[in-house]
Amino acid sequence: MTENEQIFWNRVLELAQSQLKQATYEFFVHDARLLKVDKHIATIYLDQMKELFWEKNLKDVILTAGFEVYNAQISVDYVFEEDLMIEQNQTKINQKPKQQALNSLPTVTSDLNPKYSFENFIQGDENRWAVAASIAVANTPGTTYNPLFIWGGPGLGKTHLLNAIGNSVLLENPNARIKYITAENFINEFVIHIRLDTMDELKEKFRNLDLLLIDDIQSLAKKTLSGTQEEFFNTFNALHNNNKQIVLTSDRTPDHLNDLEDRLVTRFKWGLTVNITPPDFETRVAILTNKIQEYNFIFPQDTIEYLAGQFDSNVRDLEGALKDISLVANFKQIDTITVDIAAEAIRARKQDGPKMTVIPIEEIQTQVGKFYGVTVKEIKATKRTQNIVLARQVAMFLAREMTDNSLPKIGKEFGGRDHSTVLHAYNKIKNMISQDESLRIEIETIKNKIK
């Protein structure tokens, strides 16, 4: 990369980071690369699924950086992974044929869903360790964490990660013997083979795998047909003894798998246990920003933030909300999804789903003020003494965490401040919490008073 190309690309990244939320930047921009700038055309390498986002949101960034560095209008030519020939062990491997090879494999054997990958999994603080462990397992199956046990509530991405592990291994080794199956289906297969007196076939099928991916293992903990846990125990031992990778997911920790034999619980804890929790606001915004690329509608930022505030339990609710909105927008022949349209579309889902308590921002300001010994008037004003600034930033942080208000709306409630001020306060307090345990306890105490 020439000096001018480096300056240009650094400026593109700088402008993008200043305009986007951190989680959005990390997902859509961080992994992109500038290959060259030739004849006023910037060739940029990125994931193909992110092209539409760049076209919609970063054109002005490219133009600005282009005029600053080259004093010219720079256009963009996007290059995708499947277009690049990657030399590996002196063999050129093209990603597109690899993907075709994956799709052409007998899916009845692995039952993997090819749409799930690490590349399209949105990372946040709530799932970072689970993702890192999953990637490590996919890179060196059977040697790193065996078994890998991922637990968390429904709709948080456990099934996505299971399939991503399998697909990643299969891309590197198309001959790998992989099986994705729910614990419920494992039980069903066991019952069928018992009835047909073909247990040898079941043993052959599962005990000679290279990678076993079991979803919702808690189903095995139910009181099932005698011998099911015994068979799974023997399958587990056969695979583990041969250094074959096992990955399990559950809605609870191994120790809370009631009615499961102790010897199985013990084995589930041999490797690594990681937790996935509900996505925070910033991750939900990134998830929505990614998902709306699948729809032919315009979603203004305030609409995205509104939706992110409405559903805080899992990703499936967010996906369902977008489907509801698509239905209403198509019926009304609307191109731009305003907050009002979104609210109308998701009304039934909100009534049927878990209710979010509506917390006035003024209540947050009041409780924060009482805790830190300042008035609401001081929180809204411009005075910058240390205790008032801390109270103000904590109140902004909680307003974003505990309400569905957009950043501009929150800023308005704090003396008409700009949305960037709110975002700065939110990021600052979030960073401080990760380093200051006493502040984290203070904020939890305030949250409990508000609730």
Curated annotation (Swiss-Prot):
Region annotated Domain I, interacts with DnaA modulators, chain positions: 1-77
One GO cellular component term: plasma membrane
Superkingdom as given in the UniProt entry: Bacteria
Chain positions covered by the region annotation Domain IV, binds dsDNA: 330-451
Stretches for region Domain III, AAA+ region: 111-329
Function: Plays an essential role in the initiation and regulation of chromosomal replication. ATP-DnaA binds to the origin of replication (oriC) to initiate formation of the DNA replication initiation complex once per cell cycle. Binds the DnaA box (a 9 base pair repeat at the origin) and separates the double-stranded (ds)DNA. Forms a right-handed helical filament on oriC DNA; dsDNA binds to the exterior of the filament while single-stranded (ss)DNA is stabiized in the filament's interior.
Subunit structure as annotated in this protein's UniProt entry: Oligomerizes as a right-handed, spiral filament on DNA at oriC.
Name of the protein this chain belongs to: Chromosomal replication initiator protein DnaA
Organism: Streptococcus pyogenes serotype M4 (strain MGAS10750)
